[in-house]
Amino acid sequence: MPGTSSARPDSKAVISPIAFDIINRPTPVEAADGRMHLAYEIQAVNQSTLTVTVNRIQARAQKSTIGKSLAGEDLINRTRLNDGTTGSATLGAGESAMLFLDVSYSKKRRNPKTIAHAITTSWPDPVTIGETVKQTFVGVGTKVSKRKAIEVAAPLRGNNWVA
């Protein structure tokens, strides 16, 4: 007897050696630089037997880019492999990492309701020696929180505060 599912086919789905997931919805925060920021993490898990490099991440909202693209040293500096090492955006077979994003945009722009990401990855072609497979896709989306960011301001009330 065939099974049934309520899930519908996703015509935009991409098969990637790395699974990406946003753990918590980002909350818009007005920062000291006068810009709005979305600070959040993307978990990356290499579910393949290949060594895969994350080359570039660009946040997108309402079908356009938002914030600066992360690539090269900027991306490497915001990547922490889950074995505690830093200095690489390359994941070996079965490895995982956290990518720390800080997407900033003008206060004049409306806060996005959702964000997605254009992600470029690459890996050695297992069929053609010396060749590299490069893949770019748009996905890894999440809703943006509507909650107001927590504000810490004077005067602070309560016990055990040190000033």
Q: What is each stretch, according to the model?
A:
Residues 8-20:
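Proline/serine/threonine-rich low-complexity linkers at boundaries of modular beta-sandwich domains
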Residues 66-110:
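Intrinsically disordered, low-complexity Pro/Gly/Ser/Thr-rich segments with frequent PxxP/GP/PP motifs
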Residues 23-24, 34-41:
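Short, solvent-exposed loop/turn segments enriched in Ser/Thr/Gly
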Residues 51-54, 67:
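Short acidic/proline- and small/hydrophobic-mixed sequence motifs that coincide with surface turns
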Residues 44-51, 61:
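Asparagine-centered strand-capping/turn motif at beta-strand->loop junctions
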Residues 147-163:
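Compositionally biased low-complexity segments at domain edges in trafficked proteins
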Residues 41-44, 119:
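Buried hydrophobic-core signal for structured, non-transmembrane domains
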Residues 104-150:
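Terminal connector regions
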